Amino acid sequence: MSTILKSLPKGENVGIAFSGGLDTSAALLWMKQKGARVFAYTANLGQPDEADYDEIPRKAMEFGAEKARLVDCRSQLVHEGIAAIQSGAFHVSTGGVAYFNTTPLGRAVTGTMLVSAMKEDGVNIWGDGSTYKGNDIERFYRYGLLTNPDLRIYKPWLDQQFIDELGGRAEMSAFMTAHGFAYKMSSEKAYSTDSNLLGATHEAKDLEHLDSGIRIVNPIMGVPFWRDDCAVAAETVSVRFAEGQPVALNGKTFTDPVALFLEANAIGGRHGLGMSDQIENRIIEAKSRGIYEAPAMALLHIAYERLVTGIHNEDTIEQYRISGMRLGRLLYQGRWFDSQALMLRETAQRWVARAITGEVTLELRRGNDYSILNTQSPNLTYAPERLSMEKVEDAPFTPGDRIGQLTMRNLDITDTRAKLDLYAKSGLLSAGEGSHIPKLESDKG
């Protein structure tokens, strides 16, 4: 039996992820008038551009909802954000600047917590505002069914009758006004914004064109650091971790991770830290472009990775990065709670994060321009005396030890030279003159 309903299930309980915006307001009123019993669920994700969360359920009741609930998702969202930092679950980057998967993390929390709330109310049909071209339709589908295997999906934007009657924002506004709800459309921005406590995503409209960029964006979590009239003073910041958990900023200890994230957002936001422009591959293998903000995630990630490199050995760091890339892609695809993701995540949290205790001091300047000023940890394996260029007592190794180590390298050097000669004879490489190393055919000048 298909879990996706193509038309409105009249007379049944239908839950809708309700934002209070024009789209979901019109959808709720329309579904009510067409005979569904509509239940509205709003996720409090700490969106920086949301002024009054309590007003949203009240609006839903005015539009005809049988019940409207505000679900506080902030603690769970921060928990998942810290887990992503601990496991390096970020696979999209440009020039070394990462996208911190803030929207996928938000969908993982929203998709599970709202459907769980619906299930408590006996609601087993769920609708939301995601479109068929995007990632969210699949993310919500997966998380919804993982949470409630009896769930069925109804999306107004996949219902042809809804599209025919209310196919655009002008039609939705007229529909609301005609039924006594004066709904003035907000002025159209040059792009669309979606946000939560971890970060903001700006995309679509003018930002679909690569000749439009960050300069048309008005940040909601930071400052437009690229503008000459935007004053940004350098600031020294310290971040302390205890067994992989961020616990203090500038010497102030936080027992509430949400409060710590809010402060980290304020600190990083003053500089525009964590803003990036990315071209990424959507789940359906088509490319899209987004401009992102994530000041707290960026600040904590920088400090965390500094401690990782000072504490763990090269092989552990390599595995952390490889696994993090894979985990980031799984998170992006809506598979954050799949077994393969849990395996990668738990491994990093157990064997990498548990050792991360210490404090990193940085100087933040404009955008992603920063310097690391100090790194302290009782677990550092960085020991400068081991490699000091000065004479030290009780040196860990001697010139004679290094001669022996280099002599052992003759084994693989001899084997490598034999392989290069073999490749030259087979035509893969051009033979070098004298003792010159053979070259690839494409390297011959």
Curated annotation (Swiss-Prot):
Residues annotated as binding ATP: 17-25, 43, 129, 131, 136, 194
Biological pathway: Amino-acid biosynthesis; L-arginine biosynthesis; L-arginine from L-ornithine and carbamoyl phosphate: step 2/3
Subcellular location: Cytoplasm
SUPFAM superfamilies: Adenine nucleotide alpha hydrolases-like, Argininosuccinate synthetase, C-terminal domain
GO terms for cellular component: cytoplasm
Alphabetized GO MF terms: argininosuccinate synthase activity; ATP binding; protein homodimerization activity
Catalytic activities: L-citrulline + L-aspartate + ATP = 2-(N(omega)-L-arginino)succinate + AMP + diphosphate + H(+)
Pfam families noted in UniProt: Arginosuc_syn_C (PF20979), Arginosuc_synth (PF00764)
Residues reported to bind L-citrulline: 99, 135, 139, 192, 201, 203, 280
Binding positions (L-aspartate): 131, 135-136
Superkingdom: Bacteria
E.C. designation(s): 6.3.4.5
UniProt enzyme class: ligase
Keywords: Amino-acid biosynthesis, Arginine biosynthesis, ATP-binding, Cytoplasm, Ligase, Nucleotide-binding
Database matches in InterPro entries: Arg_succ_synth_type2_subfam, Arginosuc_syn_C, Arginosuc_syn_N, Arginosuc_synth, Arginosuc_synth_CS, Arginosuc_synth_type_1_subfam, AS_cat/multimer_dom_body, AS_multimer_C_tail
Major localization listed first in the record, in broad terms: cytoplasm
One Gene Ontology term from the biological process aspect of the record: argininosuccinate metabolic process
UniProt xrefs under PANTHER family: ARGININOSUCCINATE SYNTHASE
Family: Belongs to the argininosuccinate synthase family. Type 2 subfamily.
Subunit and partners: Homotetramer.
Protein name per the record: Argininosuccinate synthase
